[in-house]
Amino acid sequence: MTSVLRLVLLAISALSILSILTPSPVLAQENPYIVAYDHYLEEPGNLEIEYFSTYGTQRGGNDFHAFWAEFEYGATAWWTTELYLDGQTTFKDSTIFTGVKWENRFRVLKGEHFLNPVLYVEYEHKSGADKILKEGEGHDVEADFLAPNSEARKEHINEMELKLILSSTYKGWNFTQNTLAAKDLSNSPWEFGYALGASRPLALKASAKRCNFCPQNFVAGAEMYGGLGDRHSFGLHDTSHYLAPVLAWNLPSGWTLRVSPGFGLNHNSHQFLMRWGVAREITGFGSMVSRLFGGHK
């Protein structure tokens, strides 16, 4: 699995060099959320490369550092597709590759509306050692992460996940609600979860000058997420829940930095999750690839 991680890092490095060499026009602001989704999709033909990291505390076991890379592509104006590569390091244990995920988001309505629905469909192949905690679902609790990597990686999970994203933007504020339903493709019941988010730029009026530290480059907010049990036991019993402030810094160069300290809200949750991420937009990536392989401009 070490060779896989090396290949992932090599791919990210190569694409990052390409992104630096590619001129970046003025881009739309990225939201600050790490778990919740709003209704904005990737621009058609653009590729966004993202790296995220989560440090998590573990009562009764070793703390961990989970990380994942995302490659998000705007296929059309109404469809964004994304590939995830996940890994984790459990302190005093080992570093392992934990899975892949293919995510698709579909915009249902054209234009802006008071409520903007987006359909989310995801397939995930992962091991039981996956710790990225990208969503809350079912009866997942902190104690589930106690197994050593050598044992947890033996469990193989093939999962389908569906979300209904309802998002609205009003006077600069974005409010979003995500409802989740996930199904292990083995003989397991449907599991449910939620994510809520609210955010706003620190300033709505853009500066006349290009600057890195202008208030409008910062988007702040909060998100809350957790599990809602499964088909046989729906509700809050034996579920975990988190509340996290979120902050995004959108640089004129096309880079976005995110940070989010998260706090467990009950005894089933990890007490503390520290998340951060960096993203870079490559505009016109689809056109560049088409030209490279002899397509039309």
What are these model-derived regions, one by one?
Residues 1-5:
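N-terminal secretory signal peptides that target proteins for export/translocation
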Residues 6-8, 34:
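Short helix-onset patch at the extreme N-terminus, typifying the N->h transition
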Residues 8-23:
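Bacterial N-terminal signal peptides
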Residues 27-297:
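Transmembrane beta-barrel domains of Gram-negative outer membranes and organellar outer membranes
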